[in-house]
Amino acid sequence: MLMINSFDNPRLAQAFVDYMATQGVILEIQRHDTWDIWLADEAQAERVKAELSYFLAHPGDPRYLSASWQTGQLNAGLRYRSYPFMASVRAHAGPLTLGMMALCVVAYLAMSIIGSPQVAVWLAWPFDPSLKFQLWRYVSPLLLHFSLLSLIFNLLWWWYLAGPLERSVGSGKLLTLTLVTALVGGVIQYQIAGPWFGGLGGVVYALVGYVWLRGEREPESGLYLPRGILVFMLLWLAIGGLGLFGNKTANADLVAGMLIGLAMAMTDTLHARKRK
């Protein structure tokens, strides 16, 4: 086998592999510290390298964006080596993504052992004027999850969305998006329902908005959200707004998060186009 190229961005690697599959060339991705592209049929090496040169110069070309659909399957020509579960989790995420997951788990365990009321008193939004200078309280409600289902749901989506964003755009952008959403969403929740709220839901929806819109407007960023997932998240938001899960007030935080994500993505893509 012949190694063709190594990618830091797995989405770019998959886009190239999917496109070559539509051209009748089967490539294999082997995932280590980078995503390495391997070719079994070395007789096609020159053709693949020529295509690679064009791909690296024009990663946003529509031919690559539609390749997965043309093949009729989402993993056309794509074969991964199996790696331990935790290694796969780490490979998909950066330090901020993993750190937030760890803190949420620790907070949930503390709530289970010490008791939810006590931990909530430590981490809740400032519920008394004397607490307004305890600055961590404007962010720490993100760590509070009041059910195991809520924790699992939010952490899975956080990992799925925040990981690629951090790897593609950087930890700074993820931190900014998280802090802005925590502050704005917290103010909204406090005004509507008081200080006793928590969870990553608002940030998850900010990530949905950001990843989707930036991926649509700037494909070369390496960000991409399948439209099926976008539709699912919007339906979930609508169902929550009807109060079918018993907490309509939390929906304001989710809507605010989505709008923040969309606004930040629009701002970033406009700035990127001006620089060009």
Curated annotation (Swiss-Prot):
Q: How does it sit in the membrane?
A: Multi-pass membrane protein
InterPro entries, alphabetized:
GlpG_N_sf, Peptidase_S54_GlpG_N, Peptidase_S54_rhomboid_dom, Rhomboid-like_sf, Rhomboid_protease_GlpG
Which GO BP terms sit in this record? proteolysis
Gene Ontology cellular component list: plasma membrane
Is this entry keyworded Nucleotide-binding? no
Alphabetized UniProt keyword annotations: Cell inner membrane, Cell membrane, Membrane, Transmembrane, Transmembrane helix
Q: Which GO terms describe its molecular function?
A: serine-type endopeptidase activity
User: According to its UniProt record, where is this protein mainly located?
Assistant: membrane
Span-the-membrane segments of this chain are 94-114, 142-162, 168-188, 192-212, 225-245, 252-272
Q: Where in the cell is it found?
A: Cell inner membrane
Gene3D superfamilies documented for this protein:
3.30.70.2350, Rhomboid-like
Q: What PANTHER family does this protein map onto?
A: RHOMBOID PROTEASE GLPG, RHOMBOID-RELATED PROTEIN
Q: Which family does it belong to?
A: Belongs to the peptidase S54 family.
Give the protein's recorded name. Rhomboid protease GlpG homolog
